[in-house]
Amino acid sequence: MDHRLLEIVACPVCNGRLYFNKEKLELICKVDGLAYPVRDGIPVLLENEARKLGVDEITQ
């Protein structure tokens, strides 16, 4: 994931910062506890496509 893209994308729910998880290919919103998938290098920033994070994942 291009670091420049991370500077301009935001969580569609809260407009907060997103963090890239290289291992799971997801963009993480720690505020809402959501993980958005990245498919073929393209972030899928749709709330209904997001995965709810567990408490242990949010604190990482």
Swiss-Prot record:
Domain of life: Bacteria
Gene source species: Pectobacterium carotovorum subsp. carotovorum (strain PC1)
Pfam families reported for this sequence: Trm112p
Record's protein name: UPF0434 protein PC1_1771
SUPFAM superfamilies the record matches: Trm112p-like
Disulfide bonds: none
Transmembrane region(s): none
Entry's family note: Belongs to the UPF0434 family.
GO CC, any one term: cytosol
